[in-house]
Amino acid sequence: MSIIVISGCATGIGAATRKVLEAAGHQIVGIDIRDAEVIADLSTAEGRKQAIADVLAKCSKGMDGLVLCAGLGPQTKVLGNVVSVNYFGATELMDAFLPALKKGHQPAAVVISSVASAHLAFDKNPLALALEAGEEAKARAIVEHAGEQGGNLAYAGSKNALTVAVRKRAAAWGEAGVRLNTIAPGATETPLLQAGLQDPRYGESIAKFVPPMGRRAEPSEMASVIAFLMSPAASYVHGAQIVIDGGIDAVMRPTQF
């Protein structure tokens, strides 16, 4: 039985992924603020440190997979928490867990980015540059003082920087024998999306943002792709970002890919 660690396992895509992987016979070690084997607040350095210690204690012989789903949206009240969870809550965990993954059987990791990751250019984004430099306090300050666009900046900027972080790790992880990929979901029927729809700042634009397929995704549709990426069937998929958005990115950026 393989051991797979999932952050953000209590709701949304993380919960759907847990269901699919457990049904396939995998043992799950979940991380979340509730309803998980490891209870942790990834918005703080202390919470991330404790999460890492608790997971490694449960996976002393190694782990076979890692799925990083924990994330916050643009409507989050404390915008600094968006960049802390979305970026540091993923990069610090993936780096800390690489040695354990190297001990696993056909190990693989999937990080949840977003179709919004393509909305900003990394080299022209002060937030992304601060995140890459590990300057958490500076990154939090940037979004908290960004005015009306702070939420969108925090979300898209953190996902942009996260995708770059994964791609820049592809060489080292490949040499270590651990596959690492991201998925970029579009609008998915999760509590995170519902919170956005109910926010007067974002609700109307989200509601009007309908993919060419005419509907939003279900979490299970993300989970099935994650399960594939974690499986031996994806043995040569590495360093990739898989866009699962019902065609939105193709419509918005047909010549950019």
Swiss-Prot record:
Which reaction equations make up its catalytic activity?
A: a 3alpha-hydroxysteroid + NADP(+) = a 3-oxosteroid + NADPH + H(+); a 3alpha-hydroxysteroid + NAD(+) = a 3-oxosteroid + NADH + H(+)
User: What triggers production of this protein?
Assistant: By steroids. Derepression of gene transcription occurs by binding of the steroid inducer molecule to a repressor protein.
An example of a GO molecular function for this protein is: nucleotide binding
Subcellular locations according to the entry: Cytoplasm
Any one of the GO CC terms: cytoplasm
Can you tell me which residues form the catalytic site? Answer: 155
Pfam families in UniProt: adh_short, adh_short_C2
What EC number(s) is this enzyme filed under? Answer: 1.1.1.50
Q: Which residues bind NAD(+)?
A: 8-13, 32, 41-42, 71, 155, 159
Write down the top EC class of this protein.
Answer: oxidoreductase
Q: Which SUPFAM superfamilies match?
A: NAD(P)-binding Rossmann-fold domains (SSF51735)
State which residue ranges cross the membrane.
none
Q: Where does substrate bind?
A: 114
**Where mainly found?**
cytoplasm
Q: Which UniProt keywords apply?
A: Cytoplasm, NAD, Nucleotide-binding, Oxidoreductase
Q: What does this protein do?
A: Catalyzes the reversible interconversion of hydroxy and oxo groups at position 3 of the steroid nucleus. Along with the 3 alpha-hydroxysteroid dehydrogenase and 3-oxo-reductase activities towards a variety of cis or trans fused A/B ring steroids, it also reduces several xenobiotic carbonyl compounds, including a metyrapone-based class of insecticides, to the respective alcohol metabolites. No detectable activity on testosterone, progesterone or 3-oxo-desogestrel.
As for family, the record states: Belongs to the short-chain dehydrogenases/reductases (SDR) family.
Note on file? This protein is thought to initiate prokaryotic steroid catabolism.
Q: How does it assemble?
A: Homodimer.
Its name, as the record gives it, is 3-alpha-hydroxysteroid dehydrogenase/carbonyl reductase
Organism classification, top ranks? Bacteria, Pseudomonadati, Pseudomonadota, Betaproteobacteria, Burkholderiales
